[in-house]
Amino acid sequence: MQTPTPDDAPDESAYDLLQRGQALLTRNHHAQAAIVLERADRLEPGKGSILEALGRAYFNSGQASRAQLTFEALLDVDPLSHFGHYALGQSLKRLGRRQEAGPHLRLALAMSPQSTLYRAALTRLGLPPRSSLEP
């Protein structure tokens, strides 16, 4: 997704940066995590684990447009990522694109029907979960 820059330290691997970014996310330092995870993405573009963490960092730091693009990139790499669909739906919802959010949230719940998180997101959107018997 990003091109390497001269600021990228050559001795830090994408894995090290991912670990550091995830630690920052855990401590709710979302904007700082985004910076670190962008570096990881430049080193290993298109890696699902990096894209997921980067999307979370963008979303939680109030960068919904960047989160949307990142979760779309994640779904290009891993179309079966139920979290990717959930997170894209949440990003679209935050951007005021509720109609576009619905199908992604429904798909996330269909892929992971036990998820109370996905079910609650659909309910908050005003969409009841569909029965598996519905067409």
Regions found by a protein language model. Give the residues of each.
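TPR-adjacent "capping" and linker segments in tetratricopeptide-repeat scaffold/adaptor proteins
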Residues: 1-16, 132-134
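Alpha-helical segment of the N-proximal tetratricopeptide repeat
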Residues: 11-43
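Structural signature of tandem alpha-helical TPR/SEL1-like repeats
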Residues: 27-38, 61-73, 95-107, 129-135
